[in-house]
Amino acid sequence: MKTKLSHLAVGALLCTTGAAQAQGISAVQGLRFDVGYSLIKLATPPTSYDPVGIRLGISKAFFPGIDVEGVLGTGVQSGKNSVSPTLTKDVGPLWGAYIKPGMAINKDFGLFARVGFASTQIKNGDTHNGFSSGLGLNYALDRNMRAYADYTFYKTSDTLGISALTLGVNYGF
């Protein structure tokens, strides 16, 4: 159900991206760099883990309102098992490549989505590759800098879910 809602939201945002051109989602349409702090959820039903990570990103405006984005990240703190707290898991390296449509809500706030491919490794475990999507909100701190919050699904299946709430800042040139 979460995946279907995410797909619908991404589709709706793609359909309304033209509004971003008229409103000017950002004064900076060039290269952007971002860094974020991620609260990761590793769901392995019936249990889950809650590691913490960092994520770095770079994006470039492809068309007004549509960016191409690449992200790299890793876990920085292991997450405890929700049933047996002595068991822990950590996320290893992760990377993703995305198309990132966005639109202005007003002159300071913007809404964005991401849809693409991600590869996520669980330390001392498997690597998981596949479709990835997410939604986010950003706030213009000044002409070049934004604060953002996003929720991204890196892997969704019946046996494993990897998602993260990321809070960060990005800077554009």
Spans of model-derived segments:
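Cleavable N-terminal export/targeting peptides
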Residues: 1-30
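Short glycine/proline- and aromatic-enriched beta-strand/turn motifs that initiate or cap beta-hairpins
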Residues: 21-68, 72-78, 101, 109, ...
